[in-house]
C-alpha cells in the first residue's frame, strides 16, 4: 500500500468500505450530500477537474479561469500527481473515458 500510514485507521477503513458499496451516481449523491458540506464536495470535485486539466497539459491561468481554483490548490494537485500515491489515477478523466462514454460522464 503506497498511502500515508498515518491515514490508515479503523474509522477511515469503515468510511472507504462504505464508499465502495455505492453502485450508482444517485447513491453517491445521497451519501456525499449527507457526509459532506456543499463546499467540501465542490472542493473535491474542483480538485479532480484540476487534475484532469493538468493531465491534459493546461496551464495554471487556464485552470484557474476554468475552475476558480487558486494557484495554491493547483500547485497542491500538481504535486500530488507528480509525487503522490497515484490516487487520482483510477478516477482520472482518461481512465474513466476508457470505461464509459463521454455522455455517461456529463
Feature annotation, model-predicted:
Residues 1-20:
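General nucleic-acid-binding
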Residues 27-46:
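Short, Lys/Arg-enriched anionic-surface-contact patches
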Residues 63-65:
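Short alpha-helical "recognition helix" segments of helix-turn-helix
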Amino acid at each position: 500500500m503506497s498511502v500515508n500510514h498515518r491515514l490508515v485507521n479503523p474509522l477511515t477503513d469503515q468510511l472507504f468500505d462504505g464508499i465502495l458499496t455505492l453502485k450508482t451516481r444517485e447513491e453517491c449523491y445521497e451519501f456525499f450530500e449527507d457526509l459532506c458540506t456543499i463546499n467540501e464536495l465542490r472542493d473535491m470535485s474542483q480538485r479532480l477537474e484540476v487534475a484532469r486539466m493538468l493531465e491534459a497539459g493546461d496551464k495554471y491561468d487556464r485552470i484557474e479561469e476554468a475552475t476558480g481554483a487558486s494557484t495554491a490548490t493547483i500547485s497542491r494537485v500538481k504535486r500530488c500527481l507528480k509525487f503522490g500515491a497515484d490516487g487520482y489515477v483510477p478516477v482520472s478523466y482518461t481512465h474513466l473515458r476508457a470505461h464509459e462514454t463521454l455522455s455517461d460522464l456529463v
